[in-house]
Structures are given as structure tokens and as C-alpha cells.
Amino acid sequence: MTEEMLYAALLSFGLIFVGWGLGVLLLKIQGAEKE
């Protein structure tokens, strides 16, 4: 793998991880408000 491919893979994985983290955080906030 070239450096560019590795960087692209890390970037895409990072975006997915950040998006998942934000989704979980929002669900926790909404759940706390409902209770």
C-alpha cells in the first residue's frame, strides 16, 4: 500500500469512528432527557 492509500484508509475509518461516536453520544443525551 502506498502512503496515499494508507492515509485515505485512515481518514475514512476516522470519519466513520467519529460519526459513530457522535451518534452514540446523541442517543445517550436523548435517553437522559426522556428519563
From Swiss-Prot:
- List the residue ranges forming a coiled coil, or say none: none
Mark the transmembrane ranges.
6-26
Q: Does the keyword Lipid metabolism apply?
A: no
Provide the topology term for how it sits in the membrane.
Single-pass membrane protein
What's in the keyword line of the UniProt record? Electron transport, Membrane, Photosynthesis, Thylakoid, Transmembrane, Transmembrane helix, Transport
User: Which terms in the GO cellular component ontology are assigned?
Assistant: cytochrome b6f complex; plasma membrane-derived thylakoid membrane
Q: Name one GO biological process term.
A: photosynthesis
As for subcellular location, the record says:
Cellular thylakoid membrane
One GO MF term, please? Answer: electron transfer activity
What is the protein's known function? Component of the cytochrome b6-f complex, which mediates electron transfer between photosystem II (PSII) and photosystem I (PSI), cyclic electron flow around PSI, and state transitions.
The record's comment on protein family reads: Belongs to the PetM family.
Provide the assembly information: The 4 large subunits of the cytochrome b6-f complex are cytochrome b6, subunit IV (17 kDa polypeptide, PetD), cytochrome f and the Rieske protein, while the 4 small subunits are PetG, PetL, PetM and PetN. The complex functions as a dimer.
Give the protein name, as stated in the record: Cytochrome b6-f complex subunit 7
- Mind giving the lineage of the organism this protein is from? Bacteria, Bacillati, Cyanobacteriota, Cyanophyceae, Nostocales
